[in-house]
Amino acid sequence: MIEMENIVVEDEATPQRRRIWLLLPLAAFLVLVALFYFRLGAGDPSRVPSALLNKPVPEFALPSMLGGQSVGLDSGDLSIGVHVVNVWASWCGPCRLEHPILMKLADDRRFEVVGINYKDVPENAERFLGALGNPFAKIGADRDGKTGINWGVYGVPETFVVKDGVIVHKFIGPLSEEGLAKDLMPAIEKALGATTATAQST
Protein backbone atom coordinates (compact mmCIF):
# COMPACT_ATOMS: atom_id res chain seq x y z
CA MET A 1 0.00 0.00 0.00
CA ILE A 2 2.76 2.39 0.94
CA GLU A 3 4.64 1.61 -2.27
CA MET A 4 1.56 2.38 -4.38
CA GLU A 5 1.07 5.74 -2.63
CA ASN A 6 4.70 6.62 -3.32
CA ILE A 7 4.27 5.79 -6.97
CA VAL A 8 1.18 7.99 -7.24
CA VAL A 9 2.95 10.96 -5.63
CA GLU A 10 5.91 10.49 -7.92
CA ASP A 11 3.66 10.41 -11.00
CA GLU A 12 1.91 13.62 -9.94
CA ALA A 13 5.19 15.43 -9.25
CA THR A 14 6.75 14.58 -12.61
CA PRO A 15 4.44 16.78 -14.78
CA GLN A 16 4.87 19.61 -12.29
CA ARG A 17 8.64 19.41 -12.62
CA ARG A 18 8.29 19.37 -16.39
CA ARG A 19 6.22 22.56 -16.27
CA ILE A 20 8.88 24.25 -14.14
CA TRP A 21 11.62 23.30 -16.61
CA LEU A 22 9.50 24.56 -19.50
CA LEU A 23 8.92 27.90 -17.76
CA LEU A 24 12.59 28.50 -16.92
CA PRO A 25 13.59 29.77 -20.41
CA LEU A 26 10.61 32.14 -20.41
CA ALA A 27 11.58 33.47 -16.97
CA ALA A 28 15.17 33.99 -18.11
CA PHE A 29 13.95 35.86 -21.19
CA LEU A 30 11.74 38.14 -19.09
CA VAL A 31 14.67 38.93 -16.80
CA LEU A 32 16.80 39.89 -19.81
CA VAL A 33 14.01 42.11 -21.17
CA ALA A 34 13.69 43.83 -17.78
CA LEU A 35 17.44 44.45 -17.61
CA PHE A 36 17.47 45.86 -21.14
CA TYR A 37 14.47 48.08 -20.30
CA PHE A 38 16.15 49.59 -17.26
CA ARG A 39 19.51 50.01 -19.00
CA LEU A 40 17.72 52.21 -21.54
CA GLY A 41 16.76 54.63 -18.81
CA ALA A 42 13.93 52.93 -16.92
CA GLY A 43 11.76 52.84 -20.02
CA ASP A 44 12.15 56.55 -20.77
CA PRO A 45 12.45 56.79 -24.58
CA SER A 46 14.17 60.17 -24.30
CA ARG A 47 17.15 58.39 -22.77
CA VAL A 48 17.77 55.80 -25.47
CA PRO A 49 21.52 55.92 -26.12
CA SER A 50 22.80 57.15 -29.47
CA ALA A 51 25.74 55.62 -31.34
CA LEU A 52 26.72 59.15 -32.41
CA LEU A 53 27.19 60.57 -28.93
CA ASN A 54 30.60 62.23 -28.50
CA LYS A 55 31.26 61.89 -32.22
CA PRO A 56 31.44 64.57 -34.92
CA VAL A 57 28.16 65.43 -36.62
CA PRO A 58 27.66 63.58 -39.90
CA GLU A 59 28.62 65.62 -42.95
CA PHE A 60 25.55 67.20 -44.52
CA ALA A 61 24.46 70.20 -46.57
CA LEU A 62 20.75 71.00 -46.70
CA PRO A 63 19.00 73.65 -48.79
CA SER A 64 16.94 76.35 -47.15
CA MET A 65 13.36 75.52 -46.28
CA LEU A 66 12.27 79.15 -46.42
CA GLY A 67 11.72 80.61 -49.88
CA GLY A 68 13.29 83.95 -49.02
CA GLN A 69 16.54 82.45 -47.75
CA SER A 70 19.30 81.23 -50.02
CA VAL A 71 21.31 79.65 -47.19
CA GLY A 72 20.19 76.41 -45.56
CA LEU A 73 22.07 74.43 -42.94
CA ASP A 74 25.24 72.36 -43.17
CA SER A 75 27.66 70.61 -40.85
CA GLY A 76 30.07 73.54 -41.01
CA ASP A 77 27.47 75.75 -39.31
CA LEU A 78 27.80 73.58 -36.19
CA SER A 79 31.59 73.53 -36.02
CA ILE A 80 32.05 76.35 -33.49
CA GLY A 81 30.12 76.96 -30.28
CA VAL A 82 27.05 75.27 -28.81
CA HIS A 83 24.02 74.52 -30.98
CA VAL A 84 20.65 72.97 -30.23
CA VAL A 85 19.57 71.05 -33.33
CA ASN A 86 15.86 70.26 -33.49
CA VAL A 87 14.50 67.76 -36.04
CA TRP A 88 10.86 68.59 -36.73
CA ALA A 89 8.02 68.56 -39.27
CA SER A 90 4.73 70.37 -39.75
CA TRP A 91 2.86 67.04 -39.92
CA CYS A 92 4.21 66.06 -36.50
CA GLY A 93 1.66 66.65 -33.71
CA PRO A 94 4.21 66.43 -30.85
CA CYS A 95 6.36 69.04 -32.67
CA ARG A 96 3.51 71.50 -32.23
CA LEU A 97 3.32 70.68 -28.52
CA GLU A 98 7.03 71.28 -27.92
CA HIS A 99 7.27 74.44 -30.02
CA PRO A 100 6.80 76.90 -27.11
CA ILE A 101 9.85 75.30 -25.44
CA LEU A 102 11.94 75.96 -28.56
CA MET A 103 10.73 79.56 -28.65
CA LYS A 104 11.91 79.93 -25.05
CA LEU A 105 15.30 78.37 -25.86
CA ALA A 106 15.75 80.76 -28.78
CA ASP A 107 15.75 83.69 -26.32
CA ASP A 108 19.00 82.43 -24.77
CA ARG A 109 21.82 84.05 -26.74
CA ARG A 110 24.55 81.83 -25.32
CA PHE A 111 23.79 79.18 -27.94
CA GLU A 112 21.99 78.90 -31.27
CA VAL A 113 18.85 76.92 -32.05
CA VAL A 114 18.78 75.50 -35.57
CA GLY A 115 16.29 73.22 -37.29
CA ILE A 116 16.26 70.25 -39.62
CA ASN A 117 12.86 70.13 -41.33
CA TYR A 118 12.26 66.42 -41.86
CA LYS A 119 10.39 64.94 -44.87
CA ASP A 120 8.09 67.93 -45.10
CA VAL A 121 6.32 70.04 -47.70
CA PRO A 122 8.03 73.48 -47.64
CA GLU A 123 4.75 75.41 -47.86
CA ASN A 124 3.31 73.48 -44.91
CA ALA A 125 6.47 74.02 -42.88
CA GLU A 126 6.38 77.76 -43.59
CA ARG A 127 2.73 77.94 -42.49
CA PHE A 128 3.63 76.06 -39.31
CA LEU A 129 6.32 78.59 -38.40
CA GLY A 130 4.14 81.49 -39.50
CA ALA A 131 1.46 80.43 -37.04
CA LEU A 132 3.66 79.43 -34.10
CA GLY A 133 6.79 81.54 -34.53
CA ASN A 134 10.27 80.72 -35.81
CA PRO A 135 12.83 79.84 -33.11
CA PHE A 136 15.48 78.75 -35.62
CA ALA A 137 18.50 80.82 -36.60
CA LYS A 138 18.90 78.51 -39.62
CA ILE A 139 16.77 75.75 -41.11
CA GLY A 140 17.76 73.00 -43.52
CA ALA A 141 15.19 71.05 -45.53
CA ASP A 142 15.79 67.29 -45.28
CA ARG A 143 13.15 66.39 -47.84
CA ASP A 144 14.27 62.81 -48.50
CA GLY A 145 15.14 62.06 -44.86
CA LYS A 146 18.73 60.97 -45.60
CA THR A 147 20.29 63.47 -43.21
CA GLY A 148 17.92 62.34 -40.47
CA ILE A 149 18.96 58.73 -41.06
CA ASN A 150 22.64 59.68 -40.84
CA TRP A 151 21.94 61.45 -37.55
CA GLY A 152 20.27 58.30 -36.21
CA VAL A 153 16.83 59.87 -36.01
CA TYR A 154 14.16 57.43 -34.81
CA GLY A 155 11.29 59.82 -35.52
CA VAL A 156 10.34 63.44 -34.99
CA PRO A 157 10.77 65.40 -32.89
CA GLU A 158 14.34 64.80 -31.75
CA THR A 159 16.75 67.34 -30.30
CA PHE A 160 20.54 67.27 -30.22
CA VAL A 161 23.10 69.34 -28.35
CA VAL A 162 26.21 69.94 -30.45
CA LYS A 163 29.41 71.48 -29.09
CA ASP A 164 32.13 72.51 -31.55
CA GLY A 165 30.83 70.07 -34.15
CA VAL A 166 30.47 67.11 -31.77
CA ILE A 167 27.13 65.61 -30.69
CA VAL A 168 27.16 65.62 -26.88
CA HIS A 169 23.50 64.94 -26.08
CA LYS A 170 20.35 63.57 -27.67
CA PHE A 171 16.74 63.95 -26.53
CA ILE A 172 14.10 61.78 -28.19
CA GLY A 173 10.49 62.90 -28.27
CA PRO A 174 8.74 66.21 -27.62
CA LEU A 175 10.36 68.59 -25.17
CA SER A 176 8.36 69.51 -22.08
CA GLU A 177 9.06 71.87 -19.20
CA GLU A 178 10.19 68.88 -17.16
CA GLY A 179 12.33 67.47 -19.97
CA LEU A 180 13.90 70.88 -20.47
CA ALA A 181 14.67 71.39 -16.78
CA LYS A 182 15.88 67.88 -15.97
CA ASP A 183 17.48 66.73 -19.21
CA LEU A 184 18.13 69.16 -22.04
CA MET A 185 19.08 72.32 -20.15
CA PRO A 186 21.64 70.56 -17.91
CA ALA A 187 23.23 69.13 -21.08
CA ILE A 188 23.33 72.60 -22.65
CA GLU A 189 24.82 74.14 -19.50
CA LYS A 190 27.44 71.39 -19.39
CA ALA A 191 28.37 72.05 -23.02
CA LEU A 192 28.54 75.79 -22.38
CA GLY A 193 30.71 75.22 -19.31
CA ALA A 194 33.09 73.02 -21.27
CA THR A 195 33.30 75.66 -23.99
CA THR A 196 34.06 78.39 -21.44
CA ALA A 197 36.72 76.26 -19.74
CA THR A 198 38.39 75.55 -23.09
CA ALA A 199 38.41 79.24 -24.01
CA GLN A 200 39.95 80.20 -20.66
CA SER A 201 42.73 77.62 -20.94
CA THR A 202 43.88 78.86 -24.36
Label each PLM-derived region with a short phrase.
Residues 60-84:
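A short beta-strand-turn-helix
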